[in-house]
Amino acid sequence: MIELPVSIPTPDGTADGYLYRHESSRPLAGIVHLTDIHGVRDASRGMARRLAEEGYTVLLPNVFYRTRNPPMFDFPVNFGEERTKQRFAELTQPLTPEAIARDATAYVDFLRREKSVGSGAMGVVGYCFTGALALRIAAARPDVIVAAASFHGGGLHTDAPTSPDLLLPEVKAQVHFGHAFEDRSMPAEAIAKFDEALAAWGGRYESLVYDQARHGWTVPDSAAYNRDEAERAYANMTALFARTLGGSAS
């Protein structure tokens, strides 16, 4: 597996990140792998590398490039403390729906320019805060994104006029949403409303509550990491990508 640091040009600046390229000489489907709120680090690099080993070219962008380069938190993270809340706001506020749409095209176009990427369909996966970003990217580039996955994604349904689920009519991808059974950012009531939106949409989807999982369960360096449920989530994600993109998992 080849890991390359990359600079991704966007209309709003340059996003740093990594590209994971299989040693195979044939072009492979591209996947955009979005990190959780903690950004690009050893854990997320390992997750992206593992996915690439399934037979894909994977782009791991620093989605918070407008604010800072890694690490996202240069102090102990405690979401009950003001400085953590302030940093969270600094990282997320620039990611407006319009900014995410611009980034979507930048990431897709970057992958398309890579010789290791085929000219066809792509996928996207997001975790935590970026679960909603994965949905927004699928809506922004329905011409390319045929598979989207989200794990412990927060705020997929809100009462705001910019709620991510309102974009479902724009999405042509098959989607998988994995929810935690205990998640303040996506409580049971919000999951129920989100499932109603998915059913009304009429596309091909999976929306599952991982019964033994808390928010952050898929990420190896998370305090909530649950190996068994993380492996279940990984199997569901790779099955989605195998159905839609091929890869060695097919």
Positions of predicted regions on the chain:
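N-terminal cap/leader regions of alpha/beta-hydrolase-fold enzymes
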Residues: 1-250
